[in-house]
């Protein structure tokens, strides 16, 4: 089975300021991975049932063959037939036990299926293969610009209420608040809550993130339920709360599984954003360090021979002159040029007066500085 493609999250940008505009947010795509995960679990459950049924049928086929063979051997009185009969009867006994095991597992699976909690994919079934009803035609999908404008306008108007809803804990409180503020039951609220979760995780406010994540899943369930029933979300949110408040432990566990999976995705997205921000910061710092020749002094320093690194560590020019003298001239010139281009070594004013000097001038300069004291002696 192919893995879920989570790349739909890549376009969600975590704001680092007070800008409430988050362009190009597509809630159906954003939550599609949750729906896909649930569908895959349902498919896995169905496949398990099919495998159990196939196993039971295969076991029964082998048992029927063994029983037939036992009847045939029972008619024969030959010595060899008696030995084979004993062996076949043992096999028959083994297959009967396996049949009971397969049947028990299949019965448990079927019982588990009946206890499975409802979701937006199983809540409603087709009652008729065809219906003739006058329905409102689907409106044209909003453009990206329209989505951005709609989201920005909504957040500007309801940001305070959305944040309040995100901090609620009890089912009754959430239902009551949505009853008082039905306009919050929409995709724009879900958009804001998701981004709010990622922002909080980036800021390392983990407890708050988990609280808002809970309310995000609540809103997601309501929106998916409305989509399945083809009704306005504002008209079915009470139905969700009635179910969740009276659900058995298994249904509550299913809700919690959805919540935990969502929080893991939030942590993953936050980690990616933090790593991206760190890389951008490191690149900015690197650009600030670049020398006149466009090289990074840190990278150049790390590429130098240990003996040259020691010269720069101790800021000892005499030591550097000695090291340069002992090195191969070509290698020394190359190292000194990189040192200048990165700003590790700053030539004297004489060297800056002419741009036409060769790259080896720096090497000659260091060498000359070493020879001049010797001449004076």
UniProtKB/Swiss-Prot annotation:
InterPro entries: Cdc37, Cdc37_C, Cdc37_Hsp90-bd, Cdc37_Hsp90-bd_sf, Cdc37_N_dom. Residues 364-377 have a biased composition (Basic and acidic residues). This is Hsp90 co-chaperone Cdc37. GO terms for molecular function: heat shock protein binding; protein kinase binding; protein-folding chaperone binding; unfolded protein binding. Keywords: Chaperone, Cytoplasm. Co-chaperone that binds to numerous kinases and promotes their interaction with the Hsp90 complex, resulting in stabilization and promotion of their activity. PANTHER family: CDC37-RELATED, HSP90 CO-CHAPERONE CDC37. Pfam families: CDC37_C, CDC37_M, CDC37_N. The gene is cdc37.
